[in-house]
């Protein structure tokens, strides 16, 4: 019975790691894309119209792409840590992944609550003098989020690789 329970736990840990790796890859590459093409500059300066409302899920808003998957990032990393706790070789990587994912989630929560409403969703675009300091802060916090998602993704990938090698 212990072997079956252990087998189920390993199966569950593998599945959770797969979900965590996918969701963190989505998060990292989405964050990278936002920086490279300066999505915040575009969305912050866009005038509201019938076709392009200034809303979290309006056309052009990254919210549409993150909403389905983003809420599972930190929970998946934490669940992977719990499910894989019995594997000493991958435990440190899972700890790093959970901590990094939680850091990224906290940075995201800060942006969503403190910066994004004024910067992106006010009825009209802010003046340049009001917009530029918010954009600067947004990019600084986003750098933390990008680094956290990269570290979490790399740690999850390493934990998954170690688990696969141990079956070898």
Where does each model-flagged region fall?
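Interfacial segments of alpha-helical transmembrane regions
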Residues: 10-25, 83-104
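Hydrophobic alpha-helical transmembrane segments of integral membrane proteins
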Residues: 97-117
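Core segments of transmembrane alpha-helices
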Residues: 67-81, 145-153
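Interfacial loop at the N-terminal end of multi-pass membrane proteins
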Residues: 4, 13-15, 23-73, 118-135
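Basic/polar N-terminal segments that are highly enriched at the extreme N-terminus
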Residues: 1-15, 163-168
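Terminal transmembrane helical module of multi-pass membrane proteins
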Residues: 143-160, 165
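Eukaryotic polytopic
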Residues: 135-142
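Short hydrophobic alpha-helical membrane-entry/anchor segments
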Residues: 33, 82-89, 110-113, 158-168
């Amino acid at each position: 019975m212990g072997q079956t329970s252990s087998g189920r736990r390993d199966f569950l840990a593998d599945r959770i790691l797969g979900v965590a790796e996918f969701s963190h890859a989505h998060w990292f590459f989405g964050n990278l894309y936002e920086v490279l093409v300066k999505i915040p500059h575009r969305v912050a300066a866009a005038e509201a119209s019938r076709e392009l409302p200034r809303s979290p899920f309006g056309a052009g808003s990254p919210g549409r792409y993150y909403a389905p998957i983003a809420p599972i990032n930190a929970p998946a990393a934490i669940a992977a840590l719990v499910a894989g706790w019995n594997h000493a070789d991958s435990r440190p990587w899972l700890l790093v992944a959970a901590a990094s994912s939680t850091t990224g989630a906290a940075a995201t929560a800060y942006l969503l609550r403190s910066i994004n409403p004024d910067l992106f969703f006010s009825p009209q675009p802010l003046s340049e003098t009001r917009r530029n300091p918010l954009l600067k802060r947004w990019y600084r916090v986003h750098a933390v989020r990008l680094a956290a998602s990269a570290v979490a993704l790399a740690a999850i990938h390493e934990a998954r690789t170690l688990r696969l090698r141990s079956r070898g």
